[in-house]
């Protein structure tokens, strides 16, 4: 554990990052820069990266005076923390009037001490399925080649190979081609929400671009079954998951998904069938549960309607439908998770905490996946029109309080395999 705060980092605009030993780094919660408790810093995990934030000056605490001031030596710096980790504070900076909107990544605070980069976060998930060290690109490419030869006419396999694994190096797609763990099934080119931070589609007039291209076709049940059954039969801790970052809303394709699940279960009972969704169609969820859907993960930025709706901009569904979908899955004895976008200063507000407690009690939620929110913080708060985020407790304390009140709820970052759901949650997974 650190005994003093790390120093602030800045970038010279030419790809070089330096520390400024006249300033301690601060963290951001909501709109505010604050000191970060020393026990919340850990070394930047493997797979993490540092970003220059153009048009922004970092906010630090003067080592001599203890006063906050800007670091005017260069541009502010933030960290991308890798999957399985949840950040406690955002990078704190002042944005200049001509600063560009930041792309859709997470911007965690970062500091420098003892010749190492430190970030305020925790490893929330022990599953190693997306750890950077676990990938060998040659093995991925060999797996891609073999799959394309095995399924030469399967558009989904081609999409996962050429778009996801090779172009974007998507961890889920790469795992499929290595033959392990969770296998993605993108299934819907359409969506019934217009999320302002959508990672697969952005309007041309917007100041940001999506991080990947969306699926352009509707896959058939045959295409889905062809490659998922062998995966379930042979992979370790196997999961197949409808609903991915390169598509719209999978529940819009529920009939095809239903047909797929029926056929998959005719061939194998092994593994877990999961759907990642916005939870907008509880009746469709019920239909899928009837034929063997094992788990659901519902994504949301907030469990409060007035924060959720300006971000998701839902079409033809109500905020309340989300929680009904969780209740439906629980009524069938399935596994329920939320994919909870963590924004320090919003997620840990007292109002959000109280609303989350209510959701857990009313839905029987089994797991929270504490995901870092990939979005420009200023842009996001402006878009949803939040000027005051209210009283906050800190993300670390939020994690502790929820666990204290609901000791059976599980924390993580990934969908658990059936072995983990039915067996020892602390041991039965890839590690």
Describe these PLM feature segments.
Residues 168-203, 239-242:
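N-terminal pre-triad scaffold of radical SAM enzymes
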Residues 1-151, 354-431:
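Auxiliary Fe-S-binding modules of radical SAM enzymes
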Residues 254-269, 320-334, 389-411:
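Alpha-helix-loop-beta-strand connector modules within alpha/beta enzyme cores
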Residues 182, 186, 202-259, 265-284, ...:
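Core AdoMet radical
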Residues 245-247, 278-280, 301-303, 341-343, ...:
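Active-site beta-loop-alpha junctions enriched in small/polar residues
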Residues 283-290, 345-362:
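Catalytic cores of alpha/beta
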Residues 142-146, 150, 155-170, 199-227:
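Short, flexible helix-coil linker/hinge segments at the edges of structured domains or between repeats
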Residues 313-315, 325-352:
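Conserved strand-turn element in the central/C-terminal portion of the radical SAM core barrel
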């Amino acid at each position: 554990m650190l005994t003093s705060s790390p120093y602030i980092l800045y970038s010279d605009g030419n790809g070089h990052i330096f520390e400024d030993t006249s300033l301690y780094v601060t963290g951001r919660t909501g709109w505010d820069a604050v000191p970060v408790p020393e026990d919340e810093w850990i070394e930047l995990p493997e797979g993490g990266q540092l970003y220059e934030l153009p048009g922004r000056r970092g906010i630090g605490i003067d080592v001599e005076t203890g006063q906050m001031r800007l670091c005017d030596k260069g541009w502010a710096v933030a960290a991308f923390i890798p999957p399985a980790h949840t950040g406690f504070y955002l990078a704190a900076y002042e944005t200049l009037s001509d600063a560009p909107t930041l792309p859709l990544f997470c911007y965690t605070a970062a500091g420098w001490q003892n010749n190492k980069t430190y970030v305020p976060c925790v490893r929330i998930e022990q599953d190693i399925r997306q750890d950077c060290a676990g990938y060998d690109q040659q093995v991925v490419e060999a797996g891609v080649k073999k799959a394309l030869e095995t399924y030469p006419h399967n558009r989904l396999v081609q999409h996962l190979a050429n778009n996801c694994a090779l172009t974007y190096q998507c961890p889920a797609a790469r795992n499929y081609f290595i033959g392990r763990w969770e296998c993605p099934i993108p299934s819907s080119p359409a969506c019934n929400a217009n999320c302002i931070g959508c990672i697969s589609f952005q309007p041309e007039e917007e100041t940001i671009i999506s991080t990947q291209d969306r699926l352009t076709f509707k896959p058939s049940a045959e295409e889905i079954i062809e490659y998922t059954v062998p995966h379930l039969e042979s992979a370790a801790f196997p999961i197949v998951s409808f609903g991915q970052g390169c598509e719209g809303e999978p529940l819009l394709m529920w009939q095809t998904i239903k047909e797929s699940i029926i056929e998959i279960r005719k061939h194998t009972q092994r593994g877990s069938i999961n759907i990642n969704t916005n939870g907008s169609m509880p009746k469709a969820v019920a239909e899928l549960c009837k034929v063997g859907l094992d788990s659901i993960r519902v994504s949301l930025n907030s469990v409060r309607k007035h924060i959720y709706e300006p971000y998701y901009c839902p079409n033809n569904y109500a905020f309340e439908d989300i929680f009904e979908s969780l209740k439906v899955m629980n009524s069938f004895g399935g596994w329920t998770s939320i994919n909870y976008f963590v924004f320090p200063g919003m997620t840990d507000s007292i109002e959000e905490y109280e609303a989350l407690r209510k959701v857990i009690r009313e839905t029987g939620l089994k797991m929270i996946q504490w995901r870092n929110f990939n979005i420009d913080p200023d842009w996001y708060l402006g878009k949803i029109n939040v000027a005051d985020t209210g009283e906050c407790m800190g993300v670390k304390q939020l994690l502790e309080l929820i666990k204290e009140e609901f000791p059976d709820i599980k924390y993580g970052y990934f969908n658990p395999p059936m072995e983990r759901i039915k067996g020892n949650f602390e041991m039965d997974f890839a590690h």
